[in-house]
Each structure stands twice: as structure tokens, then as C-alpha cells.
Amino acid sequence: MEDKNNDKEKKTDVTFEDDEDNEDLEDNSSKYENDSETDQSDLGDLPGDAVDRDDDIDEPFISQVQWPQSFRETTDSYTIAASPIFGSLRSNPPSFYRASRSNLDVESKAPLLPERHDDSDKASATQSAWSHKGSFAEELPIGGYGCSVIQTIFNAINVMAGVGLLSTPYTVKEAGWASMVILLLFAVICCYTATLMKDCFENKTGIITYPDIGEAAFGKYGRILICMLLYTELYSYCVEFIILEGDNLTGLFPGTSLDLLGFRLDSKHLFGILTALIVLPTVWLKDLRIISYLSAGGVIATALIAVSVFFLGTTGGIGFHHTGQAVKWNGIPFAIGIYGFCYSGHSVFPNIYQSMADKTKFNKAVITCFIICVLLYGGVAIMGYLMFGEATLSQITLNMPQDQFFSKVAQWTTVVSPFTKYALLMNPLARSIEELLPERMSENIWCFLLLRTALVASSVCSAFLIPFFGLMMALIGSLLSILVAIIMPALCFIKIMGNKATRTQMILSSIIVAIGVVSGTLGTYSSVAKIIRNYQ
């Protein structure tokens, strides 16, 4: 009897808590209504020009498409790598998880399209209140919590400076020293488009993520398009990691093979499969915060590789003696794809912006981040090509002599780093697919495991189908990264800002769109043609 009474009390408590949440939402809704009525009544006492200025203020952005609901949560893993007090950005999980109804622990799912209500103002206010409660970035008091400028720079570099560093010397081989001009040009353009995204956030309250920008600019189809681009880009990074592991482990353990049931696996295929088996348990994890902390080592890994290249050239008996052509026109499209890949961190920049304690310093942090990345990419590109010349391979680590200490440091750093990032890249795609499944199926643990296993297996198959690291990177950069980092931010800025943008901003944004379309087309065509040529 006591147990039954306790159960009843628990049920009563849960119901009471739910009622409190509902009352909070209703109170917020009525508060917004009262505030709006007060504002309207006050307008009658104001001069006509003041009324006109109030009419110019945009209404808060409220998403009308509920897919994907998990995008911000799953990409926030990148912004807690250098969070203050090591994870304080997650200090208030209950309100955060209430906002993400797609979480597997939630008992019910929201429809992809919200139901229409007669009282649209009240519904809008309620949704705004719900959005506010679910935004941990808005809950962070300025000056008390949130990332500082240095932490923001660290997080941004952790997102951008990755495996693209390995292929920068190869771009000099393919395109000549003129590729350095493309390196600088794309850095300036991508840095500018990152600041355009900030302007979009500040123009309308309620724009939190990159998909929100797409919807605010072009409606639900804009949101879906950007989501598809982002998820495809994240998935392609996972494919690139499998290729990377196969190539570098083959260099460390040449001649390795396996004969099993009449099938012979060479070293690249064997290590690709082993890599998938190692990362699979990390993809099965529901809480990826530990992995996100480990992924913060990506900045250290990038620095280690750059330092290793320097010391290998100065003390390893290799030297910097090679020279090259000023420009190789046939390789320019390849360089476009590689550097498009290198500077594409825009999918996570919104999360980084929202995590800042002082958002007014976002531009300063982004500019600093891009300057550091230019120095890293440019330094390794120049040193790597001067060391190996026309013998430079698609990954600088494959050129390094096996008997050198700094070669081992760079190679093993390259091998270990992707294991801390693979799950973080695959998780957003897996969560978005779960949102589209029926509720009973998506909440089943076997569905959870099988879906992620299938995604990992498909990434391995894709890596085996296109096992060309450099060409795959150039294709990703030309086809996806240029769209994500150059074309779409500029287009969305033009659409969202409209007459509020200055003439200079509109002209620059239009030029950037044109550059993105031309360079993306050239790079994609060149990459696809070279991949086909490798199969002929």
C-alpha cells in the first residue's frame, strides 16, 4: 500500500511540474500580449515619425519547420571544447533538453510542420518563450559565463584547422605558387561571410542556427537545402577520415594484409575496416561530451604536425631546396577545392557565436582565427613543397621518412586525431534521420544501434569506392564547402538584410556569390573529371 501511495505521489509531482511548465509558458505568452498591448497604446502618444520607426522593426523569427530539431544540440559539441569551468555551457541541461524534443529520452515528438492556431499572436509568443527557455546561450549572463575571446578563437581553430592541413603542400605542386593567392583570397572571403552570418543573427531575434538563417531567407525550402548541405558535408568528412586512416596506417605498417574465407584484404582496405570497428563504439554513445573534450586536442594535433614538418626540414637532413613553377593553370581548380575545404567552419560558427559571453567581439575572434589558420596552412604548404618538390603526395605525412622521430610524431598524430572527431561528425546526421522515423521505431535501442552501424558501414564503402584523399577533399570543398561557406551566407545576407544593408555590403555580397558559383563549378568539374580518369 505504501508503494502504491508513493507511486501516486510521484505521478502527482510529475503532473504538478508539467503544470508549472505550462503555466510558465502561458504567463510568458500573456506577458508578451500585455507588453504588445501596452506598446500599441503608447504609440498613440508618439509623433508619427516614431511610429514609423517602430514599424520598421522586424518581427522575431519563429521557425515554421520543425526538422531538424537536434541540429544545434548535436553541433554544440564543438563549442564546449574550451568552455569556461570545463563544461559550464551545459550547466543547465533540463531547460536545454526541453527545447530539443527530438531527444531519444523525450516521450513525444513534435510534427515536422506545426499545427495552425486561430490565435496566431499567442502561439507565436508561446513559441518564442519556449525557444527562449531552450537556449542555453541566452541563459548565460554576460560577464559571468560563456566563452571569452581566447576560448572562442580556440574553438573556431579547432573546427577549421584539421586534415586539410595535410594537403596544402600538394596544392602547391598541382597549382604552383599561385595557389598561395587562392589561400589568401578564400581566407578573406570566408572570414567576411562569417561576419555576414553574425549580421543575420543580430537582424532578427530567434535566428540561432545556420538552418534558421536559411529559413529566414528562403522559407522552409531554404532550411531544408542548407540542412542537406550540412549533413552531406559532415558525412563526407567521415568518409575522408576512413581514407586518411587507411593511407597513413599503410605507411606505418606497409605490406600488411589479411586472408579470410578466400578473400584477401590489402593494407588500405584492412585498416579502413579496422578504423570503422574502432570508431563504432564511440558512435553508439548517447553522451558525446567526453569525446568533445578530447576533440579539443585537434588544435594541439594541428600544431604538432606543423612543428614536426618544420623540424623535419631543418634537422632531419631533408632541407628546403626544391623550387616550383609560379602557376600551373590546370591545377587551379584543385587548389580552389582544397582551400574551400580548409576554410569551411560555417556550419558551427552560429554555435560558437551563441556561446560567447560578449558577442560584440565575434568579428575580432573570427578575424584572429582566420589569420592563424592562414599562417598554419601557408606555412605547412610552403615548407612541405620546398622539402619534397614534385614528389609531394596528397598527404604530407606520406612523404615523411619512416626512420625520423618527427615523422613518427606527425604520422601518429594524424592517425589518432580522427578517432576523437568521427562520432561528433556522424551524430548530427544520425539524429536528424531518427527525427524522420516513426516514434516507436526511433526510440527503440536496436534502431539506435543499427542506424549508426549502417551509417559507419556506408562511410567505409564510400571510402573504398573513392579512395583518393586529395581528389575527395577537392570535390567536397568545391561541391559542398563553397556552397556552405561562401555562396549561401552571402545569398542569405542579401535576402534577410534587404534595404538595411549598405550599398557596399550588397555589392561585395553579390561579387562573393559570383566568385563562389564560378569557382565551385570549376572545382567540381575538375575533381569529378580526375576521379573518372583514375578509374579509366
Curated annotation (Swiss-Prot):
It is found in: Membrane. GO terms for cellular component: membrane; plant-type vacuole. The chain crosses the membrane at residues 146-166, 177-197, 224-244, 265-285, 300-320, 332-352, 366-386, 408-425, 445-465, 468-488, 506-526. InterPro entries: AA_transpt_TM. Keywords: Amino-acid transport, Membrane, Transmembrane, Transmembrane helix, Transport. Its main location: membrane. Residues 1-14 have a biased composition (Basic and acidic residues). It holds the Pfam family Aa_trans. One of its GO terms (biological process) is amino acid transport. It is a multi-pass membrane protein. Residues 1-68 are annotated as: Disordered. Residues 15-27 have a biased composition (Acidic residues). Belongs to the amino acid/polyamine transporter 2 family. Amino acid/auxin permease (AAAP) (TC 2.A.18.5) subfamily. This is Amino acid transporter AVT1A. It comes from Arabidopsis thaliana (Mouse-ear cress). The gene is AVT1A.
